[in-house]
A protein has these predicted regions:
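Amphipathic alpha-helical packing segments from all-alpha helical-bundle domains
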Residues: 113-142, 147-165, 184-187, 191
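C-terminal peripheral helix-coil segments that are non-catalytic and often amphipathic
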Residues: 128-140, 165, 169-234
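Generic hydrophobic, amphipathic alpha-helix propensity
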Residues: 8-16, 33-34, 54, 58-66, ...
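Helical hydrophobic small-molecule/effector-binding pocket
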Residues: 84-106, 120-132, 157, 164, ...
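Short linear capping/connector segments at secondary-structure termini
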Residues: 104-113, 173
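Helix-turn-helix
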Residues: 11, 19-53, 57
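Hydrophobic alpha-helical connector segments
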Residues: 57, 68-102, 106, 149, ...
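Short amphipathic alpha-helical elements of helix-turn-helix/winged-helix folds
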Residues: 15-19, 93, 159
Length: 234
């Protein structure tokens, strides 16, 4: 792919990301994207043969950014290696990446009917989630051995949309004054997770190393974009 083609692809992905956040998957059209980047619709189809292929590429790129930012925060956190450190990094990162926050929370306003479509990108990224992080930490001894990883992952994933609702993202309405801020929620959640899941004397350095390895694996999955064929307007 030439430099011009790479630049065009990134411009298309930038436009798709902005439009997903603004109007959502259900209303998004390839024509909208073409108009946003001032290209003929046919040139957009030369890069991505369908709307779903474009959305997949946009999701993969955003999750790659999410993984890189998450990794940077873990590297800078002297207490990284516990479950709580994962959530400290998650909240810090999602508050800065609104599309990633919508993707992680499977926000129906943004993703619409896409996650229910057969062959969607989330089906192929099913193994790069919370359960993998918990298994890595249990193997490192930074998660209590008696913890049921599958159930804990399910509970923590269910909390993600609630966490996201506390984040000041985009043009969202002011938060309910009775609702805790992201910092307050994170402080309480981190304390609960540390008390319930982290064993005494845990080797956080080892946990941090394994977490970074898991993130590297996830990043590779996000970057493994399927080969695309030249699209048509039909």
């Amino acid at each position: 792919m030439s430099v011009d083609e790479l630049a065009r692809e990134q411009a298309i992905l930038d436009a798709a990301a902005e439009l997903l956040c603004r109007i959502g998957y259900n209303k998004l059209t390839m024509g909208d994207v073409a108009e946003a980047v001032a290209l003929h619709r046919g040139l957009v189809y030369l890069q991505f043969k369908s709307k779903d292929e474009l959305v997949e590429a946009t999701v993969r790129r955003e999750l790659g950014r999410y993984a890189r930012a998450w990794r940077a925060h873990l590297l800078a956190d002297p207490h990284a290696g516990s479950v709580a450190s994962v959530y400290r990094a998650m909240v810090h990162t999602l508050s800065r990446l609104p599309l990633a926050a919508a993707i992680v929370a499977r926000d129906p306003d943004i993703l619409g009917k896409y996650p229910a479509k057969p062959g969607n990108v989330f089906e192929r990224l099913a193994n790069t989630g919370t359960r993998d992080f918990l298994r890595a930490m249990q193997a490192a001894g930074t998660l209590r051995p008696e913890v049921d990883v599958r159930t804990t992952a399910y509970i923590l994933d269910a909390l993600t949309p609630a966490i996201r609702r506390t984040l000041p993202i985009g043009d969202a309405a002011p938060a309910d004054p009775e609702r805790p801020s992201a910092d307050q929620l994170l402080e309480t959640l981190a304390d609960l997770l540390e008390r319930a899941l982290t064993p005494d004397g845990a080797d956080l350095a080892r946990g941090k190393t394994l977490l970074l390895d898991e993130l590297a694996h996830a990043h590779a999955e996000f970057d493994a974009t399927p080969n695309r064929q030249e699209g048509t307007l039909s």
